[in-house]
């Protein structure tokens, strides 16, 4: 794990629709080691390494869930809307960062009412999104505007990256900066002249997998590996039958989500690669969410796709948590798969005639 790169990516502000900070980091990281960097029309980052053989894409979405300023009242408080999926009980009194239209960072906090001022009934009722506000310490609308904050500015949770103990990494936007970091590490270290390797940082995954569709059309890949996070079911309050993944017990292979089924030959290939290299591999399903695989697998008549994920505690909140060991195992697994890939193997993934 390149912990410095992951920290840099996690501390960037890059809410869906405003991914520039992560895009810049990926450009600076990968420009020295790839043949070409291009972008699709929505802004997805596409790095190409090699120029012959089948096109193999490794995809990690750049965007994170966050908010947008929708109103500034006369007292200087900001109203906002959510971008991506949030649970209102995970938001109150958390610090946030407003990225102004000029790129400046303004700190704020999602305000909460002191318990002394709440009735017993109010204490039992969660606050709706529409009732929430952000306080940046301003005393008026004019003061807010002088700081450069305006309607339409994007808001992300405050950066809080840390390593806890020997194995855990904590921070905002691990969904899906771990995918971006791993994609970059693979582009830096995999050298296989049999394939053309693409690293993709897609945009707007959290609001509808939009960059997956546009980047798929841009590249037209032959095989796609999607990197993402998945719910860890090892904490109190989560059904560990529906969510069986546990941090520290290996990465996960997504068997299906709301928009995707993996190519079964790809699944078998990764199972075999994990066994041969003595790497742990868990399995997961997701009925209520989707990954970029849901767009890549239906583009251009259909493509072989597999989604691989890291078990993550506290997704779509201010602080997620992953295992370093899981990250390293997944990196080793995919590197081993890509290093031994040939045109013949890639072609076989799309052969569906039963052979006697």
Show where each model-derived region lies.
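N-terminal hydrophobic/helix-forming segments and targeting peptides
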Residues: 1-356
């Amino acid at each position: 794990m390149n912990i410095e790169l992951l920290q840099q990516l996690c501390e960037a502000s890059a809410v869906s629709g405003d991914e520039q900070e992560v895009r810049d980091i990926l450009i600076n990281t990968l420009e020295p080691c790839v043949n070409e960097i291009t972008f699709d029309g929505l802004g997805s980052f596409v790095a190409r390494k090699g120029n012959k053989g089948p096109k193999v894409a490794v995809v990690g979405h750049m965007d994170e869930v966050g908010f947008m300023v929708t109103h500034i009242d006369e007292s200087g408080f900001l109203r906002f809307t959510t971008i991506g999926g949030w649970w209102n009980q995970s938001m109150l009194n958390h610090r946030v960062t407003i990225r102004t239209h000029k790129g400046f960072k303004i700190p704020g906090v999602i305000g909460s009412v002191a318990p002394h001022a709440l009735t017993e009934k109010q204490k039992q009722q969660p606050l709706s999104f529409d009732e929430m506000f952000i306080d940046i310490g301003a005393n008026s609308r004019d003061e807010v505007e002088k700081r450069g904050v305006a309607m339409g500015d994007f808001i992300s949770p405050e950066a809080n990256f840390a390593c806890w103990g020997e194995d855990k990494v904590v921070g905002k936007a691990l969904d899906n900066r771990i995918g971006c970091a791993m994609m970059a590490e693979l582009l830096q270290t995999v050298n296989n002249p049999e394939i053309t390797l693409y690293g993709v940082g897609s945009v707007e995954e959290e609001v509808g997998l939009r960059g997956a569709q546009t980047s798929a059309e841009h590249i037209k890949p032959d095989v796609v590996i999607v990197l993402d996070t998945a719910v860890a079911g090892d904490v109190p309050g989560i059904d560990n039958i529906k969510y069986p993944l546990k941090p520290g017990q290996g990465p996960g292979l997504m068997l299906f989500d709301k928009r995707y089924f993996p190519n079964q030959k790809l699944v078998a290939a990764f199972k075999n690669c994990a066994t041969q290299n003595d790497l742990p591999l868990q399995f997961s399903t997701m009925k209520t969410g989707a990954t970029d695989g849901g767009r890549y697998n239906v583009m251009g008549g259909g493509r072989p796709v597999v989604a691989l994920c890291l078990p993550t505690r506290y997704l779509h909140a201010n602080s997620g948590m992953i295992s370093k060991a899981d990250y390293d195992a997944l990196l080793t697994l995919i590197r081993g798969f890509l290093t031994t890939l040939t045109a013949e193997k890639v072609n076989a993934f799309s052969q569906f005639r039963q052979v006697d």
